[in-house]
Amino acid sequence: SGAALRKYNEKLAILDFSEWIAPTLVTTNPDLILIFLGQYQDIIVKPLDGMGGREIFRLHKADPNLGSILETVMHYGTRTIMAQKYIPDIKKGDKRILIIDGQVVPYTMARIAKKGETRANLAAGGTANIMPLTEKEYDLATELAPTLLTNGVFLAGLDMIGPYLTEINVTSPMGFQEISKGSDC
């Protein structure tokens, strides 16, 4: 529904399902990002309003460009960003799971990053592989589906890296064509 599209920030919606997410921080304060980075050593930062892999950065404690990257992604402290512990399973793909009217599509599109790239988004040069959902992916999707439906979300694309939910896409849950062509759905 239109109200659900306005209510759901695709990045923040995962916070309602904290048992399924990697350690996460949402802030406008670069000092808190540095503390979070000190705790986890390897993190991803991204704007709340981004899409297609734009302005997503992987940060390491010793990165000499750390200050510049944070200034850029945080627009000099005027933009709220999300930081998440880096999930090494990204090498196996960032998986898109579709939920349509509360029903879980039993296949996923795994977006694999191109060599030398952290972002697996197709817009960033990633490739797509279609495969059946794992039991864990199916369990996550079936747990979230009723809550999404109750909140007026009839179409959603859940993004997972390894065992972690990373995003709930409601405005452009891509993957229909790829999953339809690559499966028996």
Model-assigned labels for residue ranges:
Residues 1, 26, 44-46, 82, ...:
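A structural signal for short, well-ordered beta-strand segments and their strand-loop junctions
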Residues 1-32:
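Conserved N-proximal alpha/beta basic substrate-recognition cap immediately N-terminal to
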Residues 2-6, 111-113, 161-164:
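Short glycine-enriched loops at secondary-structure junctions
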Residues 14-19, 43, 62-63:
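Short, hinge-like loop/turn segments at secondary-structure boundaries
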Residues 30-31, 38-42, 48-140:
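Phosphate-binding site of ATP-dependent enzymes
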Residues 115-116, 129-185:
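ATP-dependent carboxylate activation and anion-phosphoryl transfer catalytic cores
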